């Protein structure tokens, strides 16, 4: 593969060009422009269960009206649910503020979209792909990686990297006028104070007014839940139970779901009634510049809370520590568009095999407003939490006796003695100032 020619800077006239088509202004104008300039556009739309999309079937029809040679709707929901569950099992979330995580819902969506749309293009012998991602964002690299992983012969053509397209249709007003001039009665939607991208797992709100840190979450109108910060919004406390079998969520409130898509939709409805899973994050983009986003993920948050409760009740401390360390690393790889790279697969396999397989049980929670909740009950046949081991009451057949603890504490003398010696060395070298005003207590002599 010749990297110098992977990215095409000019429209490939007379050739098939696949475009990830959303039906919005940008992709509509781009498709028509490519058609009029002599390319053969093929439109591919991913059904990701976007909560703000009313009629998926209308999108390919619209693409045909704008001049697509063919237009296909690709149902990506089952695969997206599968990847979302995998992320929950692995704790693949590296961005958090105050203990509230961003659930990497956009990166998960890009992993599914990038592979499934390019796979559909291969079926149609379309080997040139364009999408609406900008050069400043993460998606341009994510789609690049997933596209080439799926089709190594793929060429990339992005209208927003083509100077001719930018010169002719560089803004929303110009694109709207272009469509009208060509006989399409396109009416621009009223611009919001921010942009939104969503799929079944979550929604991302960013850019425009949200680029300013003095614009808070209150300017956002949630699309997956309620504005829990608004005192006029009535939110009643609600009990909900979540059941897992071998790391897979299978039931909500006692009702089993064979279809993971329906399971996620119901989890979104439950969590959304409370605004669960909304967060405000500052993160590092792939190119190391910081960006800010407001995120929604009610179902992911609900599953994550219940899953981690079971993890902490079932696994030992060292396993939990490794699960968290690996999850942070895996979350970053997912964010970077490396969800299917070997290093990510290695981390995923470790968590799914050795952590998730033991996670069977049910957690009952009370949801209130936003991320305010209480855990009411935890049940699992695999719990290693056994209260009688540490009961403050007198119990028959105690796991250990006072004499056992005396022996255990006596063994600690070895490392305590070594630690005292090290502190003395640090003091002599000037690294520590021992005595009055020191952060350490007075140790006396070194013996």
Curated annotation (Swiss-Prot):
Matches recorded under CDD domains: ASS
Enzyme Commission no: 6.3.4.5
The protein, known as: Argininosuccinate synthase
InterPro entries documented for this protein: Arg_succ_synth_type2_subfam, Arginosuc_syn_C, Arginosuc_syn_N, Arginosuc_synth, Arginosuc_synth_CS, Arginosuc_synth_type_1_subfam, AS_cat/multimer_dom_body, AS_multimer_C_tail
Subunit structure: Homotetramer.
Annotated L-citrulline binding sites: 102, 138, 142, 195, 204, 206, 283
Protein's gene: argG
SUPFAM superfamilies with a match to the protein in the record: Adenine nucleotide alpha hydrolases-like, Argininosuccinate synthetase, C-terminal domain
Recorded superkingdom: Bacteria
PROSITE patterns per the UniProt record, alphabetical: ARGININOSUCCIN_SYN_1, ARGININOSUCCIN_SYN_2
Residues that, per the record, bind ATP: 20-28, 46, 132, 134, 139, 197
PANTHER family reported for this sequence: ARGININOSUCCINATE SYNTHASE
GO CC annotations on file: cytoplasm
One Gene Ontology biological process: L-arginine biosynthetic process
Keywords from the named record: Amino-acid biosynthesis, Arginine biosynthesis, ATP-binding, Cytoplasm, Ligase, Nucleotide-binding
Enzyme class, spelled out: ligase
Family under the similarity heading: Belongs to the argininosuccinate synthase family. Type 2 subfamily.
GO MF: argininosuccinate synthase activity; ATP binding; protein homodimerization activity
Catalyzed reactions: L-citrulline + L-aspartate + ATP = 2-(N(omega)-L-arginino)succinate + AMP + diphosphate + H(+)
Family annotation (Pfam families): Arginosuc_syn_C, Arginosuc_synth
């Amino acid at each position: 593969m010749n990297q110098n020619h992977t990215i095409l800077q000019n429209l490939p006239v007379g050739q098939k060009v696949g475009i990830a088509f959303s039906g919005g202004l940008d992709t509509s104008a781009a498709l028509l422009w490519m058609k009029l300039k002599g390319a053969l556009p093929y439109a591919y739309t991913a059904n990701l269960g976007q909560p703000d999309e009313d009629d998926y079937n209308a999108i390919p029809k619209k693409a045909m009206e704008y001049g697509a040679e063919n237009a296909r709707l690709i149902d990506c929901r089952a695969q997206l649910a599968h990847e979302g569950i995998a992320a929950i099992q692995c704790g693949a979330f590296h961005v958090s503020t105050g203990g509230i995580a961003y659930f990497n819902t956009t990166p998960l969506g890009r992993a599914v979209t990038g592979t499934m749309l390019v796979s559909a293009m291969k079926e149609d012998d379309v080997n040139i792909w364009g999408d609406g991602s900008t050069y400043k964002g993460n998606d341009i690299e994510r789609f690049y990686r997933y596209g080439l992983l799926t089709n190594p012969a793929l060429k990339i053509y992005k209208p927003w990297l083509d100077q001719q397209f930018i010169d002719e249709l560089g803004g929303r007003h110009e694109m709207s006028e272009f469509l009208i001039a060509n006989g399409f009665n396109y009416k621009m939607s009223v611009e919001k104070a921010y942009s939104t991208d969503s799929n079944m797992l979550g929604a991302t709100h960013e850019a425009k007014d949200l680029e300013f840190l003095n614009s808070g979450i209150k300017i956002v109108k949630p699309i997956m839940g309620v504005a829990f910060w608004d005192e006029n919004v009535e939110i009643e406390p609600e009990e909900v139970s979540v059941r897992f079998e071998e790391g897979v969520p299978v039931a909500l409130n006692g009702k089993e779901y064979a279809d993971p898509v329906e399971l996620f939709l119901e989890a979104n409805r439950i969590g959304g009634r409370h605004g669960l899973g909304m967060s405000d994050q500052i993160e590092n983009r792939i190119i190391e510049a910081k960006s800010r986003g407001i995120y929604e993920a009610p179902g992911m948050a609900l599953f994550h809370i219940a899953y981690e409760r079971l993890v902490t009740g079932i696994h030992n401390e060292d396993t939990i520590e490794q699960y968290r360390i690996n999850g942070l690393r895996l979350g970053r790889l997912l964010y970077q568009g490396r969800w299917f790279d070997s290093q990510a697969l290695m981390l995923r396999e470790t968590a799914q095999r050795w952590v998730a397989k033991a996670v069977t049980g049910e957690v009952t929670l009370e949801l209130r407003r936003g991320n305010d909740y209480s855990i009411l009950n935890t049940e699992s046949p695999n719990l290693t939490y056994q209260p009688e081991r540490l009961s403050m009451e007198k119990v028959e057949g105690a796991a250990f006796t006072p004499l056992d603890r005396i022996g255990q504490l006596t063994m600690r003398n070895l490392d305590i003695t070594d630690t005292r010696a090290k502190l003395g060395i640090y003091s002599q070298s000037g690294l520590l100032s021992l005595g009055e005003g020191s952060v350490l207590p007075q140790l006396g002599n070194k013996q």
